[in-house]
């Protein structure tokens, strides 16, 4: 039995497939989901989404931003404002993006601007986590 996973950003579905396991960071901690898991609704945090499939030795990795997860009858739907597939991570641009986001965070005078810069830093750190994982393979 497999889990049907669908990931959507505003306006479109960015990834859809079947997997054997999903690991995701929620606001209450990391959770692992296997087939026949009890139904849940959870708020997810910006982090690395890891999925495993029997068809591949390597996990499927992507960065997702804050959003929501719904699981019912082995069907997972993740709605997020941003999703970065592993193949779309530009390693050469990450350092520049990190410096820019850190500068914006440090110079932010309003809480809203600090929050947005912090989200960018979390996304960039998650990208680095994926690159680090792949470099250690």
Swiss-Prot record:
State a single Gene Ontology molecular function.
proton-transporting ATP synthase activity, rotational mechanism
Main subcellular localisation: plastid
Q: Where in the cell is it found?
A: Plastid, Chloroplast thylakoid membrane
Please give the InterPro entries that the UniProt record associates with this protein: ATP_synth_F1_dsu/esu (IPR001469), ATP_synth_F1_dsu/esu_N (IPR020546), ATPsynth_dsu/esu_N (IPR036771)
* Keywords (A to Z) from UniProt: ATP synthesis, CF(1), Chloroplast, Hydrogen ion transport, Ion transport, Membrane, Plastid, Thylakoid, Transport
Q: Which GO terms describe its cellular component?
A: chloroplast thylakoid membrane; proton-transporting ATP synthase complex
Pfam families hit by this protein: ATP-synt_DE_N (PF02823)
How does the record say this protein sits in the membrane? Peripheral membrane protein
Domain of life, per the record? Eukaryota
Q: Which family does it belong to?
A: Belongs to the ATPase epsilon chain family.
| Assembly behavior | F-type ATPases have 2 components, CF(1) - the catalytic core - and CF(0) - the membrane proton channel. CF(1) has five subunits: alpha(3), beta(3), gamma(1), delta(1), epsilon(1). CF(0) has three main subunits: a, b and c.
What function does this protein fulfil?
Produces ATP from ADP in the presence of a proton gradient across the membrane.
HAMAP family given in the database record:
ATP_synth_epsil_bac (MF_00530)
Name by which UniProt lists this protein = ATP synthase epsilon chain, chloroplastic
């Amino acid at each position: 039995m497999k889990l049907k996973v669908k990931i959507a950003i505003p306006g479109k579905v960015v990834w859809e497939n079947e997997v054997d396991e999903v690991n995701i960071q929620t606001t209450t901690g990391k959770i692992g989901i296997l087939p026949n898991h009890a139904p849940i609704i959870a708020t997810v945090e910006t982090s690395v989404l890891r999925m495993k499939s029997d068809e591949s030795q390597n996990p499927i990795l992507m960065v997702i931003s804050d959003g929501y997860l719904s699981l019912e009858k082995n069907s997972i739907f993740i709605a997020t404002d941003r999703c970065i597939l592993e193949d779309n991570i530009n390693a050469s641009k990450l350092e520049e993006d990190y410096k820019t986001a850190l500068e914006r965070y440090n110079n932010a005078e309003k809480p809203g601007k600090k929050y947005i810069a912090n989200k960018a830093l979390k996304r960039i750190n998650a990208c680095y986590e994926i690159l680090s994982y792949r470099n250690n393979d």
